[in-house]
Amino acid sequence: MICKYIKQNILYITNNLSILQNDKVFLIYWRILDYSKMIPKKQFSIEYVFQSSPQLLFQYLSTPSGLSEWFSDDVNSRGEKYTFFWGDSEEDARLLSKKPYEKVKFQWMNGEEDEEDCYFEFTIQMDEITKDVSLIVTDFSPEEELEESKLLWNSLISDLKQVLGST
């Protein structure tokens, strides 16, 4: 049953690649299909070094205007609900927690409320001695898609660094 559902979605995506405007849209769309809640996911974290202040970085991770600069084409928010737009598709996420200049955590709303593997989190750390700023991205991915998920985040964070002038 799951395999049939996956094959149907692969066929849909393959037939509609012209609508899915770029690789990022494809990978994000693929990762949040409903079938994904049926497949066990593995948590992973990636650390990126930034030449930016935690305050500025936080603005790009926590506000609709900041997120629309690098994460998606556009972002709307109403309270804790954020709607992310990529071309003709949109996905909703709930802001689970936000600690100024330190942490932002979102949960995709396509899954069950109690699903622990349906969130992504940004953690900002600053080394007290060197003052180096790091961003740690925590996400979940099916084991067989782990490398693609990491490549997606690498590409997204590269865009963020470019926006911040931190390349």
Positions of PLM-derived features:
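A conserved amphipathic terminal alpha-helix motif
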Residues: 140-167
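Hydrophobic ligand-binding cavity/cleft-lining segments
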Residues: 13, 19, 23-75
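Charge-dense, helix-prone N-terminal extensions
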Residues: 37-41, 48, 52, 68, ...
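Asparagine-rich low-complexity intrinsically disordered tracts
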Residues: 8-10
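Hydrophobic-ligand binding "helix-grip"
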Residues: 73, 85-134, 138-142
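Hydrophobic pocket/interface hotspot
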Residues: 57-58, 67, 82, 95, ...
